[in-house]
From Swiss-Prot:
Keywords: Activator, Cell wall biogenesis/degradation, Developmental protein, DNA-binding, Nucleus, Transcription, Transcription regulation. PANTHER family: NAC DOMAIN-CONTAINING PROTEIN 105, PROTEIN CUP-SHAPED COTYLEDON 2-RELATED. This is NAC domain-containing protein 37. GO terms for molecular function: DNA-binding transcription factor activity; sequence-specific DNA binding; transcription cis-regulatory region binding. It comes from the Eukaryota. Residues 109-164 bind DNA. Gene3D superfamilies: NAC domain. Its main location: nucleus. The NAC domain includes a DNA binding domain and a dimerization domain.
Length: 365
């Protein structure tokens, strides 16, 4: 059988029909012996030709092909049997998975069977890279498959393992995966494969370059804005402060800016720190005293219960309430004195530094 003349189609012509077109147009017209507008699919005796010879026999035009299409007539393996003969001189075609229905919109028009070519003889054949889709007309999905009659076939080579999933490097628009244990069809349409793998791609957190750059910019922005200036707050006890005119309130985490205060400001600031230390020490002493009073109170309660009973417990309770009231009054007086001292310090500091702007900063640890 001579190969088809390459001049039968114009240059640049590429034949890539869908499943619906193969079954609904080409195969239907072939079975009905009707004329096909562009006769580019050859009749091939699939069981007398090896798959690697299809490239020359089913060549269309001058363009490089990754898929080869042909019509084939199925014959029974035995005259009285029901199995189809799928053997060649070098090997045999073995069906894998389940047949897939082909629909024209919502109407069932055919079925697609997937086969893999094995070199040698069953059951010791060696699996090759050649895959074939065999299409047949069918109106009932549950009907037994036809073992005789015309079918249209698409043959292609299996995509190599580890090959980049690029449309330009795919050996075919259909590719083959290993047979699953549950018997699901191992040859998948690229669209089905992409939709199946979409959730895995995003579940792994893969991002494009623009998304990664956006994340880096966001991190850099956060790092360079650790200290954010707040708006001025109005207080009845403090005068309004001027908004800083310099970059005193903005500090970068990567660059340490040291602002040198004048001598008078330094002394005032140091006195303020010393005052804060004194107040902390006073609070520690007060808390220590309170804990001591609590210890005394618990001890007295235990002693009174053992010696005098519930009557002495009431007396101790009254005495301790008086002590607690005295402590509250002492704490209130100390708090008021500390507040007056702070107000006085701020007033002195503002009066001596009227020419300078002060900013309020929030330091995030």
């Amino acid at each position: 059988m001579e190969p088809m003349e390459s001049c039968s189609v114009p240059p640049g012509f590429r034949f890539h029909p869908t499943d619906e077109e193969l079954v609904g147009y080409y195969l239907r017209k072939k079975i009905a012996s009707q004329k096909i507008d562009l006769d580019v699919i050859r009749d091939i005796d699939l069981y007398r030709i090896e798959p690697w010879d299809l490239q020359e026999q089913c060549r269309i035009g001058y363009e490089e092909q990754n898929e080869w299409y042909f019509f084939s007539h199925k014959d029974k393996k035995y005259p009285t049997g029901t199995r189809t003969n799928r053997a060649t001189m070098a090997g045999f075609w073995k069906a894998t998975g389940r047949d897939k229905a082909v629909y024209d919109k919502t109407k069932l028009i055919g079925m697609r069977k997937t086969l893999v070519f094995y070199k040698g003889r069953a059951p010791n054949g060696k699996k090759s890279d050649w895959i074939m889709h065999e299409y047949r007309l069918e109106s009932d999905e549950n009907a037994p498959p036809q073992e005789e009659g015309w079918v249209v076939c698409r043959a292609f080579k299996k995509r190599a393992t580890g090959q980049a999933k690029n449309t330009e490097t795919w050996s075919s628009s259909y590719f083959y995966d290993e047979v699953a244990p549950n018997g699901v069809n191992s040859v998948m349409d690229p669209i089905d494969y992409i939709s199946k793998q979409q959730h895995n791609i995003f579940g792994k957190g893969l991002m494009c370059k623009q998304e990664l750059e956006g994340m880096v910019d966001g991190i850099n922005y956060i790092q360079s804005n650790q200290f954010i200036q707040l708006p001025q707050l109005q207080s009845p006890s403090l005068p309004l402060m001027k908004r800083p005119s310099s970059s005193m309130s903005i500090t970068s985490m990567d660059n340490n800016y040291n602002y040198k205060l004048p001598l008078a400001d330094e002394e005032s600031f140091e006195s303020f720190i010393r005052g804060e230390d004194r107040r902390k020490k006073k609070k520690q002493v007060m808390m220590t005293g309170n804990w001591r009073e609590l210890d005394k109170f618990v001890a007295s309660q235990l002693m009174s219960q053992e010696d005098n009973g519930t009557s002495s417990f009431a007396g101790h309770h009254i005495v301790n309430e008086d002590k607690n009231n005295n402590d509250v009054e002492m704490d209130s007086s100390m708090f008021l004195s500390e507040r007056e001292e702070e107000n006085r310090f701020v007033s002195e500091f503002l009066s001596t530094n009227s020419d300078y702007d002060i900013g309020i900063c929030v330091f995030d640890n």
